[in-house]
Amino acid sequence: MIAKICGLQSVEAAQQAVDNGADLIGVICVPNRKRTVDPEIARSISKICHGTGTRLVGVFRNQPKEEVRQLAQEYELDVVQLHGDEDWQEYASYVGLPLLKRVVFPRDVSLVSQMDGEVCTPLFDSEAGGSGEKLDWQAIGSWFQDSQLTRGYLLAGGLSPDNVVEALRVPGVVGVDVSGGVETDGTKDLAKIKQFLELYKVNVN
């Protein structure tokens, strides 16, 4: 089971996530989004991660694979997250890093059976991502139980300290991913990051 704090834009928030045991922290590498990370801050966050056991994820959306690989090298990413309509197999072989691939439920569920958990892990999220829109967890859990799949998925979309315990109980979940749910007025809230991760740890151990 893993916990991911996404959409980080400050060294302070990244340090809080690392100090409180986040497995993954994510920076948005898509240009001109409200949570797009400043390149200098991304490099600083990368330095915070290395040697701690927390892995750095770069989030991309329909960007050329050459750009993805360039930024992956520049920021020393550990994982690449594809949030658009990319062919994950093409990107996996070119970028050479483990992938998270956004899956919209129920539209994209046929893709999940094609994903190899070692190379590409599905991440259920809304179409836009980062919107705070809660998915239909019951429907996703029921689909997973009926699917006969052995590999699980990360769950995003509308998570917060208020519902992370519920999210961890959804069938097939191997990780939880939060962004807006640990913000106050559009900025990462250090207390909420700590609360989310503490609740996560208590309920997975």
UniProtKB/Swiss-Prot annotation:
CDD domains registered for this protein in UniProt: PRAI
**InterPro entries, per this entry?**
Aldolase_TIM, PRAI_dom, RibuloseP-bd_barrel, TrpF_fam
**EC numbers for this chain:** 5.3.1.24
GO BP, sorted A to Z: L-tryptophan biosynthetic process
Name one molecular function that GO assigns to this entry.
phosphoribosylanthranilate isomerase activity
Highest taxon of source = Eukaryota
**HAMAP family referenced in this protein's UniProt entry, alphabetically:** PRAI
Q: Which family does it belong to?
A: Belongs to the TrpF family.
Q: What is this protein called?
A: N-(5'-phosphoribosyl)anthranilate isomerase
Q: Which organism is it from?
A: Zygosaccharomyces bailii
